[in-house]
Amino acid sequence: MKALSKLKAEEGIWMTDVPEPEVGHNDLLIKIRKTAICGTDVHIYNWDEWSQKTIPVPMVVGHEYVGEVVGIGQEVRGFKIGDRVSGEGHITCGHCRNCRAGRTHLCRNTIGVGVNRPGCFAEYLVIPAFNAFKIPDNISDDLASIFDPFGNAVHTALSFDLVGEDVLVSGAGPIGVMAAAVAKHVGARNVVITDVNEYRLELARKMGVTRAVNVAKENLNDVMAELGMTEGFDVGLEMSGAPPAFRSMLDTMNHGGRIAMLGIPPSDMSIDWTKVIFKGLFIKGIYGREMFETWYKMAALIQSGLDLSPIITHRFGIDDFQKGFDAMRSGQSGKVVLSWD
């Protein structure tokens, strides 16, 4: 079958022909319809330090997808041939303390689809049936293909009560923009997003944020004054991993503010911890999606009117995958969707 693989320990992704995967007793075989390119896939393409330490070569990559069930393991219940599904990319062990307590998103033995085992950039994918999620009929293939990153956004945004709150989102990448849209949709008062990439800030404006701020040109304190905010932000969603953005967030949080961190900063990032202590800030680390509460909330948010369509900016057939990666690597894109039909 046709697949996109990391074939060599160097920059690039290559179109290859690989055997179709075998279906185990508890697995589903999924015929892929559409996939989306993640920032993780760009890291793998670039072959950065993280990728060199993490990715086995050769391997089929990718973990954002929608497809159709075409094969079912003999122990599987609850799925049928023809079901349209996406799937949780974190495959968990089922036997650690967190798994047994129902906190599977915190499994210490997680294996990543397209990171530690073959991924979805292929005509067919096998995953455990436990990881599959049925897509409602009124959600398009395009939107279903980005459920994985949308789940990161939903998990982060809904970590705290947002109704009537002033929310600061640092980082206007696709996940940050979707998190900002979720915050506005569920009833936040002001949703302010910051970045230095004007293309992506414009995407955030299309998604309905209160203010999209280019911090290279505007002062965040001036924006707060313009919005009538006198006590700082109630909730911070840190999506950038950029130390200056996180320090600015700490400066502008209200006392007792709550911060959810999805962005991955450098390991040696320094901050003024006195601001955390004397402001009484609560900081929560976010990884992946809650299984599967986040997935049900994702579907419900779209069904209740949340419009994510502006975040998908580029669409290509799979034979033009290089154009998709070029768009993602340029920084001048939202989500990029590849069609396998």
Swiss-Prot record:
GO terms for cellular component: cytoplasm. InterPro entries: ADH-like_C (IPR013149), ADH-like_N (IPR013154), ADH_Zn_CS (IPR002328), GroES-like_sf (IPR011032), L-Threonine_3-DHase (IPR004627), NAD(P)-bd_dom_sf (IPR036291), PKS_ER (IPR020843), Zn_alcohol_dh (IPR050129). Transmembrane segments: none annotated. One of its GO terms (molecular function) is zinc ion binding. The record marks 148 as: Important for catalytic activity for the proton relay mechanism but does not participate directly in the coordination of zinc atom. Keywords: Cytoplasm, Metal-binding, NAD, Oxidoreductase, Zinc. Catalyzes the NAD(+)-dependent oxidation of L-threonine to 2-amino-3-ketobutyrate. Homotetramer. This is L-threonine 3-dehydrogenase. It comes from Klebsiella pneumoniae subsp. pneumoniae (strain ATCC 700721 / MGH 78578). The gene is tdh.
